[in-house]
């Protein structure tokens, strides 16, 4: 019984593997046909191992060993089928030398790492390069994107105003425009003179023809009358031309004088600005040392003018202002109350100024108040005067009303 089982192993196994190869080549399935030679070799390896094992069983002579070999053979076949096909890049020997543990594989035969590790390394290197590039751009900058910073920075708005640059430009443009206007006027005057000459020549020709036609009847009288008329017309035209020329000459002179004055004033203002750029140009220079307008010296001069009762005054403000005026000091504005007049003057000398519109308003109020100062006695006199005047007016109105009522009632009684 033992030799029957042993005679089957090596030769039949080889023939069986050959038969399987033929069947795999014939079969239309893509999985078997696409299988690499590596799979075939692994099958042959497994078959040879099973053959050796079968030889051992032949020597021992046990039927149970044959059944075990068959189960082992089936396992080896299933393992060889489970193995994935080798990648195209990996050589044949390294693929054969790789050991498989279920589905996990480790390429100890080859020096090349798996593609996932290579990709990670590449990404890391790219990231490092990008970081270094960004650091370099942060230090040096990118002129192709942002451009270089200006070598000569623009002047500060406080130190250099655009109005100063516009003034000389305006003067040059005005001069050029005036020259163009002169040229246009001269060309127009030439055209007019040409037209006049043509008209004169045509009139003369017409007159000549008329003279020839009317030569038979009163030629002498007509010619003398026409000559007189021509002379009168010529004299009138000459006078008109002289007047027109004199007007033009006067206009040109006035324009030239204006230009010269404007140029000189602009030059002077530029020179003054260069000498003292912080000087205030809006205010006219005052020879006196006092800041602000002078207070009225005589309070009695207000009798001639109608009194303004100072509706903007606060209680006690008029008396305080009167004291300032008596002392000959400047009256402080509403925003400056709490400071002495000397402190206000020192602040203004050092350059502290109110905003423009508020400054103008407060100055106007201050001027009005300075002209409206009156004492307590004057106030009482004004109040009594106002009351008397009011009573007189009321009495007049009542008397007129009584008369009207009396007339109406009297007329009714008579009827």
From Swiss-Prot:
Region Necessary for interaction with CIR1, annotated ranges? 179-272
Identify the stretch(es) annotated as Necessary for interaction with HDAC3 and transcriptional repression: 273-415
User: What InterPro entries is this protein classified in?
Assistant: NKAP (IPR040466), NKAP_C (IPR009269)
Give one GO biological process term: Notch signaling pathway
Record's subcellular location: Nucleus
Q: Which domain of life is it from?
A: Eukaryota
Cross-link Glycyl lysine isopeptide (Lys-Gly) (interchain with G-Cter in SUMO2) lies at 283, 305
Q: PTM Phosphothreonine: list the residues.
A: 161
UniProt keywords (A-Z) are: Acetylation, Disease variant, Intellectual disability, Isopeptide bond, Notch signaling pathway, Nucleus, Phosphoprotein, Repressor, Transcription, Transcription regulation, Ubl conjugation
> Which portions of the chain have biased composition (kind: Low complexity)?
25-34, 93-110
User: Phosphoserine: which positions carry it?
Assistant: 7, 9, 50, 64, 149, 157
- Pfam families registered for this protein in UniProt: NKAP, Nkap_C
Q: Which GO terms describe its molecular function?
A: chromatin binding; chromatin DNA binding; RNA binding
Compositionally biased region (Acidic residues): 212-225
Q: Which GO terms describe its cellular component?
A: cytosol; nucleoplasm; nucleus
Basic residues bias locations: 35-46, 184-208, 230-258
Residue(s) carrying N6-acetyllysine:
112
Q: Where is the segment annotated Disordered?
A: 1-311
Q: Where is the composition biased (Basic and acidic residues)?
A: 118-138, 158-170, 259-270, 277-286
What disease involvement is noted? Answer: Intellectual developmental disorder, X-linked, syndromic, Hackman-Di Donato type: An X-linked recessive disorder characterized by impaired intellectual development, global developmental delay, hypotonia, joint contractures, behavioral abnormalities, Marfanoid habitus, scoliosis, and mildly dysmorphic facies.
Its function, per the record, reads:
Acts as a transcriptional repressor. Plays a role as a transcriptional corepressor of the Notch-mediated signaling required for T-cell development. Also involved in the TNF and IL-1 induced NF-kappa-B activation. Associates with chromatin at the Notch-regulated SKP2 promoter.
Family as reported in the entry's similarity comment: Belongs to the NKAP family.
Q: How does it assemble?
A: Component of the Notch corepressor complex. Interacts with CIR1 and HDAC3.
Q: What is this protein called?
A: NF-kappa-B-activating protein
User: What is the species of this protein?
Assistant: Homo sapiens
